[in-house]
């Protein structure tokens, strides 16, 4: 164990523990913007600086290991002044229109600036504004990028796709798509990890909420919404509901209040998908088609995009079944239209999904028919759903746990476990 003192508190930590981790483990939250443990420990933002007794210059706490006898100050006048200056410099190259930012209220830079009581930027602003394809499901706003390099490292070290890279030098350093490519030509799987780990609003999903609002306001349209199994486990985080209270039934109630005509749980079409995949597996296995590789699920469009760009030789081993999202859309515009006496073109199908790749999946020409349009007309993420709830002034505490509409409200446990690792395989085995 290593013994040191942080802000007058004597603590003991394991060897090779960084000063930042040592402080956080003992209730001293040193702020940071670029730090991701084991992934991005480059001290680029210099917000995590601390003062080490006996040393004139401040040191970064995220990449300096705690040593025996160290005396550290995380909030001395010298630290506060330097930290404030560093944040002000970052803000001078950041588009500070927070009220129109998707991350407003949950932005790391916004929180740190507020904590440091920064109400004015003393430096001349130099904002890097670049064009971006606004039709692509993943949106990058260069004016908000703070060059923390998180997106680069998460894509390189975790996803192994290296979609992002650094370009330029010195003060002109910025982040862009690797090889100066357009994002639509890059091997991006649309996994959303760069969006999740961006500390500001430089990366976000394309917002499709207005399309859904317009459809709900159109009296000629019958709006049918499906809610993916994974959404029920995460929507409560942004609404303040406890996990046991944030049920799928309350999501359905919220969607009905917004103006949806029918709301279903995607577990119904997940059951359809797994029956198709299980039958296909048995057929291909008995025919000897799976001697070299197993059959891979096609449920996840992010995985399908990844396989096509990185392992094209595995594409023939993907299941030919549509994903639950697309099966749901197809059923709604065929069987369900006949059941309720509507034309396919009068049905507007909406998916509430946890993944940005679902937006790209629904746009594929493979899932388009002249008589009905796309199987799925719009996809919104969990974050977009919560935004719509707030826009409609729906208080989560007032939501009731209601069942899905008939006749697609029934589903097995196999469909529910699609949202966890190994869930699709287990569902196939059950089937």
How does the language model describe each region?
Residues 46-190, 196, 203-218, 222:
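Fe-S ferredoxin-like electron-transfer domains
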Residues 1-7:
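Eukaryote-biased recognition of intrinsically disordered, low-complexity regulatory segments
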Residues 12, 147, 296:
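Conserved SAM-binding loop
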Residues 9-15:
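A short N-terminal beta-strand-loop micro-motif at the entrance of redox/enzyme domains
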Residues 12, 134, 144, 187, ...:
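Charged, low-complexity surface patches
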Residues 15-75, 79, 206-431:
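Iron-sulfur-associated redox domains of electron-transfer enzymes in respiratory
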Residues 7-9, 178-180, 230:
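Short strand-loop junctions, especially beta-strand C-caps/beta-turns
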